[in-house]
Regions:
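Non-catalytic terminal and connector segments of soluble metabolic enzymes
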Residues: 1-189
Length: 189
């Protein structure tokens, strides 16, 4: 496609689209349905610990979503996946824990509301808490530091600066389920 914002341009040949609405319903049920219950939540991990990775808008626009997803899927089970386009109120609520803590807070909110981004919920394949492992995959929040200390990390590869650092990931083990619930339960309801 000649459109730089088309799915093919953004995701390359690693993108599948259901043929019609009925096929989309079958595909969604196959990949995400919780057997025996209908909670309205896309994920079906139950009580397993989860963590959140966001492919930030600038990384989406640069066409990195598929590359990030490949690396995430190489280490974790992807239990939910959704595109979001947040308004300021929801972005402010999500990043509230950083207000007054990081000088980049306002710029982080602006980046998150600038255009669509991809939210990825992950679980550890061995059943452990995936937060630390995902943080290691993402690397330090500052891509310059990431390139020195963790050259293969997502932020080293796809980040530009502290705000446009490629990805957001859950910081604390106790926050993984809360961040995932915010996107995949609250915002999806």
């Amino acid at each position: 496609s000649s459109n730089p914002k088309s799915l093919e341009a953004v995701f390359g040949v690693r993108c599948y689209g259901s043929a019609d609405a009925a096929a989309a319903a079958r595909d969604r049920a196959f990949f995400f349905a919780a057997e025996g219950r209908n909670t309205g939540r896309v994920s079906s991990v139950g009580d397993r610990p989860t963590s959140l990775c966001l492919v930030k808008p600038h990384a989406m626009a640069a066409g990195y979503a598929g590359l990030v997803l490949d690396q995430v899927m190489g280490k974790f089970h992807v239990t939910a996946l959704e595109m979001f386009n947040l308004d300021r109120a929801n972005a402010t609520e999500f990043y509230e824990v950083y207000k007054g803590v990081t000088p980049e807070y306002n710029a982080m909110v602006e980046e998150l509301i600038s255009s669509p981004f991809l939210a990825i919920e992950v679980a550890d394949p061995d059943g452990g808490n995936p937060v630390e492992g995902l943080r290691a995959l993402c690397g330090p929040a500052d891509p310059e530091i990431a390139r020195v200390l963790r050259g293969g990390s997502l932020r080293a590869q796809f980040g530009q600066d502290k705000v446009k650092n490629g990805v957001h990931c859950t910081d604390l083990p106790e926050d993984g389920s809360l961040e995932c619930e915010f996107f995949f339960s609250i915002l999806c309801s």
